[in-house]
């Protein structure tokens, strides 16, 4: 099959997938988002959105960043759940994506055979995209939404004047979501830009991976990962990155994906806004890395340019703008002056850079237990070790799995053992089982399953 036919087939698959979204069984609605933001508020917050104000310099004539597109993106991406398996100190993450409405799962990131046989304890965690501004803390949901709005507003603003929210003609906030893609680039002049050598997500030399959408998704490896997550096909967006600037719903999904998905060793923006990431002591020389809050979203999104001790003023000025936008949206969502001030007190910060001696640094230590420091009841954490083993397994679980049953099956599907998890540290004797491959499943909402090697 020639390249043109492959290109056409991927476009057809994208179109069919978009239609299929409307035909799938309904998934749980994101009530947190629905309770915090309305279409009327959206229109007041972003009156200069692309395609809604004057003659748009990038040619948009329809409301690309409409509230309807955002709402559809939030609801549809809520159907996705990601399982991440990691072994501390062992290269690779085994990541699976599941569509909850259909039960269909597919690999997002694979590992080598050596990973499976390495006896290092395995940690499993889940990223449920229904959790976007929708966890148990209404206060943190508001903080997360304000942080999300601040960052997408900054990335796309056509404004030029401070103070944020001051109502001037060039108010940065009023011009949020004005630009759809990065200035200076178009489909016709961008071949090869933002392309990095990457064996897993190789760039297509005929296209460019400049910033597109609310979060300004950039670089081939980000387009490839998002495409794999969304469509189980990395090449759809590697070959057709313009889809992110032509489909408003997909554009918002790209922003939510980037926001919710941890990219080792970075935590996700969602995690840091819900205090679900705790840095290891002594891992960082910069004390600012041990502060919590909004500053980390800046470090995750564009820290290499804006948040380093060596960052140029043109970039550190953007740190201040993000902070001001965040505080502005907190006020819109009902925070009073003292609550907004608290975002820079008691170990929290809205600024990833304050001076050459007080700035953030790169993230290190890809550990899921750090990334989920405060575990909510709907987050299942499981460890099984040693694996392989000849005698005993130790099963470590989070508190919410106490009372659940586990089952062990042989490689032809016959159940060979079952019991109740009565402790967060349970020893399981498999000494009498023949050597071979087994599968341990926990009877819980997510039914995590582990491949066990009996030697």
Model-derived regions, located:
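GST-like fold's C-terminal all-alpha helical module
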Residues: 257-274, 278, 293-294
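C-terminal outer-membrane/trafficking sorting elements
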Residues: 376-455
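A Trp-anchored, charged/polar loop motif used as the substrate-binding/catalytic surface
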Residues: 128-133, 275-287
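Peptidoglycan-targeting cell-wall enzymes and recognition modules
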Residues: 30-261, 289-293, 297-310
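Surface-exposed helix-capping loop/turn segments at secondary-structure junctions
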Residues: 80-82, 264-272, 335-338
């Amino acid at each position: 099959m020639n390249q043109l036919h492959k290109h056409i087939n991927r476009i057809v698959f994208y179109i069919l997938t978009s239609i299929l979204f409307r035909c799938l069984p309904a998934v749980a609605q994101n009530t947190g988002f629905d309770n915090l933001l309305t279409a009327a508020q959206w229109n007041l917050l972003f009156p200069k959105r692309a395609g809604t104000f004057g003659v748009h310099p990038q040619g948009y004539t329809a409301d690309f960043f409409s509230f309807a597109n955002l709402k559809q993106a939030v609801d549809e991406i809520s159907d996705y759940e990601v399982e991440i398996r990691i072994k501390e100190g062992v290269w690779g993450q085994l990541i699976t994506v599941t569509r909850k409405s259909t039960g269909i799962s597919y690999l997002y990131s694979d590992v080598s055979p050596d990973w499976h046989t390495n006896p290092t304890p395995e940690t499993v965690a889940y990223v449920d995209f229904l959790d976007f501004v929708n966890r148990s803390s209404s206060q943190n949901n508001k903080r997360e939404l304000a942080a999300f709005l601040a960052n997408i507003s900054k990335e796309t603003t056509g404004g030029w004047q401070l103070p944020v929210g001051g109502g001037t003609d060039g108010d940065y906030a009023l011009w949020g979501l004005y630009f759809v893609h990065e200035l200076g680039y178009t489909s016709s002049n961008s071949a090869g830009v933002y392309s990095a050598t990457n064996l897993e997500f190789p760039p297509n030399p005929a296209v460019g991976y400049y910033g597109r959408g609310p979060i300004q998704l950039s670089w081939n490896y980000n387009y490839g990962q998002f495409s794999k997550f969304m469509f189980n096909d990395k090449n759809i967006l590697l070959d057709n990155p313009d889809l992110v600037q032509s489909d408003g719903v997909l554009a918002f999904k790209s922003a939510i994906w980037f926001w919710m998905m941890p990219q080792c060793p970075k935590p996700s923006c969602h995690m840091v806004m819900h205090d679900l990431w705790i840095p290891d002591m002594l891992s960082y020389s910069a004390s600012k890395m041990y502060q919590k809050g909004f500053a980390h979203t800046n470090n995750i999104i564009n820290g290499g340019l804006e948040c380093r001790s060596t960052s140029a003023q043109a970039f550190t000025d953007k740190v201040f703008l993000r902070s001001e936008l965040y505080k502005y949206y907190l006020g819109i969502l009902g925070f009073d002056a003292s609550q907004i001030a608290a975002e820079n007190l008691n170990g929290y910060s809205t600024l990833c850079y304050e001076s050459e001696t007080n700035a953030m640094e790169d993230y290190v230590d890809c550990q899921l237990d750090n990334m989920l420091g405060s575990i909510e009841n709907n987050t299942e954490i499981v460890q099984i070790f040693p694996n392989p083993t000849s005698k005993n397994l130790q099963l470590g679980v989070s508190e919410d799995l106490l009372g659940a049953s586990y089952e062990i099956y042989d490689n032809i599907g016959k159940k060979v053992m079952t019991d109740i998890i009565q402790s967060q540290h349970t020893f399981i004797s498999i000494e009498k089982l023949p050597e071979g491959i087994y599968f341990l499943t926990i009877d819980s909402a997510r039914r995590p399953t582990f491949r066990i090697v009996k030697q």
